[in-house]
Amino acid sequence: RSSDLENIRLYSVGSHAANAMHSVRPEFNIRPLIYGLPDYAAEKFSHYDLSYAGGRPLFATVGSFENRKGQDIFCKAIRLLPPETMKKASFLFVGKAAEAEMMDAVRSLTADCPDNVFYVKRLTRDEIKSLMAQCTCLVCASRDDPMPTFVTEGLIFGKPAIVSEHTGTAGLITEGVDGFVYEDDDPEKLAERLAWAIEHPEKLAAMRPACRELYESHYSKQAFSDSLQQAVKE
């Protein structure tokens, strides 16, 4: 009954989580309350040597290897790239192997493309920050991800991301301004975004101020504080 909900306030970490709840309880009024991350770019951290990536534009993804995270979709998209385009970039997968199918897809790709596809099981917090500072673009191919933290960490350093529509981040991105969204968990659509990004690194670099602004307006500790105070007032 609607009267039962009068004193209940519901909040979600973004539109993706809200949509999931609305699929079963469409009458709920759900407000956004997104986490806040520290400004890692203002901190000092040790340098992570990425020379193995060959100095090419680096596209990275971070997260445990499981079906939900969609590493297999990213692998398929890389394989769909025109050979000449693929050779212009490097790709890094970071994460522990939670599911064999995802790990097999990555290992097969690194075996077939050892010069520009790389796998690292674990990075320290400092190494993650250094990766974000140095990479060109993040890729989140998740089939279901309320608000991927590593994409937000990239925004702190002004780095754009290519994300699945099934992420919370997708609801905040302005296409081509501070990121890119692809649809339907479709490797071909992801490959199209990847190919454009690889061929236009200067345009990705020009997106940095907008990416940083996205962090400051939605994901900073100040933004979280403001949202939380507003929630308490409501």
Tell me what each language-model feature is:
Residues 17-22, 90-115, 127:
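Short, structured helix-loop element that forms part of the nucleotide-activated donor/catalytic region
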Residues 189, 196, 203-218, 224:
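A short, well-ordered alpha-helix in the C-terminal region of glycosyltransferases
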Residues 122-123, 130-135:
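Short alpha-helical donor nucleotide-sugar binding micro-motif in glycosyltransferases
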Residues 143:
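Aromatic "clamp/platform" in nucleotide-sugar-dependent glycosyltransferases that forms part
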Residues 175-176, 180-187, 196-201:
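Conserved acidic donor-binding segment of nucleotide-sugar-dependent glycosyltransferases
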Residues 160-163:
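Short hydrophobic beta-strand element within catalytic cores of glycosyltransferases
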